[in-house]
Amino acid sequence: MDQGRQVFSVDLLERYATKNRGMITCMAAGNDVIVLGTSKGWIIRYDFGVGSSNDIDLAVGRTGEQSIHKVFVDPGGSHCIATVTGVGGAETFYTHAKWLKPRVLSRLKGLLVNAVAWNRQQITEVSTKEIILGTQDGQLFEMAVDEKDKREKYIKFLFELEELPEAFKALQMETANISSGMRYYVMAVTPTRLYSFTGIGTLESVFASYKERAVHFMELPGEIPNSELHFFIKQRRAVHFAWLSGTGIYHGGLNFGAQHSYPNGDENFVENKALLDYSKLSDGTEAVKPGSMALSEYHFLLLIGNKVKVVNRISEQIIEELQFDITSDSVSRGIIGLCSDASANVFYAYDQNSIFQVSVIDEGRDMWKVYLDLKVYAAALANCRDPLQRDQVYLVQAESAFTDKEYLRAASFYAKINYVISFEEVTLKFISINEPEALRTFLLHKLDNLSKDDKCQITMISTWATELYLDKINRLLLEDDTAIENRDSEYHSVIQEFRAFMSDCKDELDEATTVKILESYGRVEELVYFANLKEQYEIVVLHYIQQGEAKKALEVLQKSSVSVELQYQFAPELIMLDAYETVESWMANKNLNPRRLITAMMRYSSGPHAKNETHEVIKYLEFCVHRLHNEDPGIHSLLLSLYAKQEDDGALLRFLQCKFGKGRENGPEFFYDPKYALRLCLKERRTRACVHIYSMMSMHEEAVALALQIDPELAMAEADKVEDDEDLRKKLWLMVAKHVVKQEKGAKRENIRKAIAFLKETDGLLKIEDILPFFPDFALIDDFKEAICSSLEDYNKQIEQLKEEMNDATRGADNIRNDISALTQRYAVIDRDEECGVCKRKILMMSGDFRMAQGYSSAGPLAPFYVFPCGHSFHAQCLITHVTSCAHEEQAEHILDLQKQLTLLGSETRRDINGNRSDEPITSTTTADKLRSELDDAIASECPFCGELMINEITLPFIKPEDSQYSTSWDLRSETNLANQRTISLPV
């Protein structure tokens, strides 16, 4: 214990605390509230939280001397119970912090209450909830009081000591909510015994159960009249207890979750029990029993004489002695007792007049040393405040284990030390005694305890540990063959441990250094394992290829973290090692670019293959072309070349006939170079394939010529493919015909019959005269008689058909001429009251009433007009005006220009009529007719109301841009303008 700093200190709180109301007989505290009981029957309440005090006379109305026997205050400082003794017997009172007058608990009259157990978990400011009272007669009662009630709610008898009737001196209670209800834990002490009660339900049912079962108690020899029981409360829960007994201080931990069953069927919640004998406090002299006791987290405060001895609960050593400033009039009795305030974590001592406060200052600061001296290392570590303290605990543990030759255990403790011993000292310790196992253990544990910021140290230690692992593996391999089974087991165990270490430290180990170390020890498998961890897959794959394990290499390459470049890099080796597995791997990976595998595929294809062996490259290329729809010309060309080298040309022809680009707009139908394909097929003598390629390239003459070398039927099919060029098609069929005629070796008449039959296959494209030149000059014409007659008959039919067509054409021309003549005589009948569609005036009006259209001559006295088949009629001038206003600008100008020219020609004619001769009157009239015809076409080709002109007007706006000023004039005026107008009120 640090002697330089006091853990407990004493201060005088109140010198004359009783205010001349007698002498202090008892005291209780809770939540910065102190309640004193005096020898004259007064209770004095000090509330240090608000700085107030008040006193209440409990002896009012009682005769004789009255003294306060005991006072009890709840942990919240609101509720107080006091027992008064005097001539008239004992009486118990209840008072609340807000009250000025006490309330008599009449049902307890005559009972001397020595102890009260508060329900700390349930109590509130306005209600005590259930509490337990212990009496001088050895009885227990349950009671509850509410601040608003005029009397206690109830008082129930719970229990009575029958075997050994003694007074109950102290009580404590704890509760816990569990699934089956409320569990109660009660401890009670008498001068010789400590009783414990527990059960589920209500207090009444719990104590009633002890009629059927034995009460659990602890009895110690000796007797003490002032027996006390204290709980230490931490976070509103009791964690340990202490009983001031006749023999010593019986104490232990409290575990209210424990379910320790005893033979008597009871359950105990006390653990780690111990007894502090009073003889340990006497320094060899006669043991003195304390007059009072208080309990802190780690210490007992024992009142012995006028001193308070502070005893460490763990070490059972006195650490301090507290002195009090006692007045001369208090010497007769000295310090009377101690009490504690669990809520405020302070203690109080009192004599007849004064109150002293005992404060605690960081009482747990040296507890780590106490536990360390007792070798309770876990508790010592739990109480350490800084890394240096923890290091000292670890050092003691390490040195102890090292002394006991438990080197592995010592290594684990040394690894946790950061300050009190250096890394070098520890390693030298293990090296000096030749303990590589312990050294490796130390290094591994040190790695676990280093922070991530110590990168250099972590790398160094990891590398050293790697060498130690490899050294251990080599030593196991070099051991004698004795106990081979055990050696192999240990060897495999170390290998697994080493691999786990590399996996954990892969980011800390320097890659280059570790690889060199593994190579130097010849640990190829571990090197591959480490390379895998570091994602150096090139090393891993190369190792598997060297071992001939293509499948394992492919499994590595298939990992998502492996770069696809390695697939291309090792493709040539892998396909030669295991073509099937390699191709299956390629087909499973959709991200590969087949073009970059061409080198590997060509290497495989260049080698010999069995006749019935599946060509793996062809399989992969077919997968690319048909399943992946690959369009790379290189892939298509390679597949084409492999097909061309096969004995059966069926696959080649099927490939050539496939249109892989069909359906794509503006795209090719195939993706290989047809010229390359042609050269390849010519080289490999794949004639049918060459014919197809020639045809595909529109080289039909070459295709037919080549086809004739192997199969005339194929040549005919090729010739028949040409459909859009009749001359070329005929030329191709002539080539076939010539070949057929020249190649026939039978009798002459038979050859002629076959040639005639061939003509029928051409569907009339070739005539007998087309193939006659192919026959020899000495061929008899009789052999062609039938064919020639048939041909002449066909010509005769064609001539007759042409004559009929000429007659039909003549009749058609006559009909057209008649229709034209009839058009000049066509007329229309109009009503006398018919109106012009534009001006709405009558159509049949005198020319004097209407200005004659320029360029038109009047039809007698009537103005010129137009009548359309639909029934609409228009004056000529109205129609011109309407059409020019609706037509586009260019057409309107053309119409006006024609009208102007007609006007000029009309004026010249009128001058001639007036006496001026015209040299070319006929020419002018002809010109006027042409202009008038053009004008008619421009304005009267269709009705302006029923034709396209009216349809186009749908898209025009109602208000034209030039009429915008009229549009704005129709807008409503603004409110401002309306406000300026004068209004006239109209009578209603």
Curated annotation (Swiss-Prot):
Look up and give the membrane topology term: Peripheral membrane protein
Which Gene Ontology biological process is one annotated for this entry? vesicle-mediated transport
Coiled-coil positions = 785-819
Mind listing the UniProt keywords for this protein, alphabetically? Answer: Coiled coil, Cytoplasm, Endosome, Membrane, Metal-binding, Protein transport, Transport, Vacuole, Zinc, Zinc-finger
For this record, an example GO cellular component is: HOPS complex
Q: Which GO terms describe its molecular function?
A: zinc ion binding
Location within or outside the cell: Endosome membrane; Vacuole membrane; Cytoplasm
Primary localization class, coarse: membrane
Pfam families membership = Pep3_Vps18
Q: Where are the CHCR repeats?
A: 589-749
- Keyword Kinase carried by entry: no
Annotated InterPro entries: Clathrin_H-chain/VPS_repeat (IPR000547), Pep3_Vps18 (IPR007810), Znf_RING (IPR001841)
Quaternary arrangement and interactors, per the entry? Core component of at least two putative endosomal tethering complexes, the homotypic fusion and vacuole protein sorting (HOPS) complex and the class C core vacuole/endosome tethering (CORVET) complex. Their common core is composed of the class C Vps proteins VPS11, VCL1, VPS18 and VPS33, which in HOPS further associates with VPS39 and VPS41 and in CORVET with VPS3.
- Member of which family? Belongs to the VPS18 family.
Question: What does the function comment of this entry state?
Answer: Essential protein required during embryogenesis. Believed to act as a core component of the putative HOPS endosomal tethering complex and of the class C core vacuole/endosome tethering (CORVET) complex. CORVET is required for vacuolar transport of SYP22. HOPS is required for the central vacuole formation. Involved in root development. Plays a role in vesicle-mediated protein trafficking to lysosomal compartments including the endocytic membrane transport pathways.
Q: What is this protein called?
A: Vacuolar sorting protein 18
Native source species = Arabidopsis thaliana (Mouse-ear cress)
